[in-house]
Amino acid sequence: MSLLIRGATVVTHEESYRADVLCANGLIQAIGENLETPSGCDVLDGGGQYLMPGGIDPHTHMQLPFMGTVASEDFFSGTAAGLAGGTTSIIDFVIPNPRQSLLEAFHTWRGWAQKSAADYGFHVAITWWSDEVAREMGELVAQHGVNSFKHFMAYKNAIMAADDTLVASFERCLELGAVPTVHAENGELVFHLQQKLLAQGLTGPEAHPLSRPPQVEGEAASRAIRIAETLGTPLYLVHISSREALDEIAYARAKGQPVYGEVLAGHLLLDDSVYRHPDWATAAGYVMSPPFRPVEHQEALWRGLQSGNLHTTATDHCCFCAEQKAMGRDDFSKIPNGTAGIEDRMALLWDAGVNSGRLSMHEFVALTSTNTAKIFNLFPRKGAIRVGADADLVLWDPQGSRTLSAATHHQRVDFNIFEGRTVRGIPSHTISQGKLLWAAGDLRAEPGAGRYVERPAYPSVYEVLGRRAERQRPVAVER
């Protein structure tokens, strides 16, 4: 099966040019002007549109067991919704229970993901520590293509990683050539503030952001960055939502530390007023962690993208329907944390970023695809338009528009946190493994078509770290 995209403007993270692109056997086979059409090849007219690398969402949680329930989106429905939005690959999370084998949890998630409609990989969370955890980390890297490990600094009495676990796991990541990632919130402070607010009679969603103020995120970001700096590891911080956390990243990067920041579309576009909505269910629908912040943090995050201190855009796609959110009707701390966004991420970033002049098209490609591929060692297989790369592409109509709504989205959740927002600039066609799976409103996703993608250890940042460590190696004093 082959597909020729004719006459589009190819846009990568570095350049743009007019060309035809031929896809066959799941790969990009040729790029050039006026390519011949092979016998039996389908032809897609790309005139007037941009052809870009398919989106990579580095942060999703499909069918996650969490807070007494299970996320409503499974791996097929979630990746299918992603294809409708231009996202062709995800990196989800394996989250073992404390004391559970990492390998056992990994195989459980692999089983769930077999129905995926798009390519996928996994970060693996470190929720406890032992010699066995260290051994299994090595096996995951060497035999299963895992090159990143997640650490939750929040969720006390559940999956929170204390400092001793952070130190041990970061050190093990360094030995393995893996990237440690963190959810940066001070779990002790969050727990304390939750109990304090509940004792004061604040039980509704409006208390959620009060229990997780920006300082809580800033402190945890600073602590994780200092641990990484001391040990000499890279660090990737997920869903940065506050100016305080961003300032910590900027300060570290100004000193040359390899720290990377991720931001969600929601944190760029929504503010904390949503938690004060008079309808409880509407307000509860926005409960996620970190919470949406006051408006001034949004502008700081946009500046973080523009300055290169934030590197990827994600969704933290973790859907809970209204009935599930109601589990916390009398206690905000029991509202399942999570929102949707995999279908809307790219259109939102284009509309609010490119159309507004905040971002160039090339920055858009970097932030939605290429940077993630580089950080997690998928480039140039993904995140690129070049011969030999995976034929994961999105044909983008800069003049097309749609209104975001639960009534029309493909995400398996009964509300949309961006309800009623109209975006200009949308995917007209999405191509995964050279197959046209989203075509002008027609979703052709196939259960099980997605592949597990192994990510090799030692992404490019380790080249610099290795030389730096050698230069700074301590030398004993001879006496």
UniProtKB/Swiss-Prot annotation:
Binds 2 Zn(2+) ions per subunit. Zn(2+) 1 binds at H59, H61, K150, D316. Keywords: Hydrolase, Metal-binding, Zinc. Carboxylation allows a single lysine to coordinate two zinc ions. It comes from the Bacteria. InterPro entries: Amidohydro-rel, Hydantoinase/dihydroPyrase, Metal-dep_hydrolase_composite, Metal_Hydrolase, Metallo-dep_Hydrolases_sf. GO terms for molecular function: dihydropyrimidinase activity; hydrolase activity, acting on carbon-nitrogen (but not peptide) bonds, in cyclic amides; metal ion binding. It catalyses: 5,6-dihydrouracil + H2O = 3-(carbamoylamino)propanoate + H(+). This is D-hydantoinase/dihydropyrimidinase.
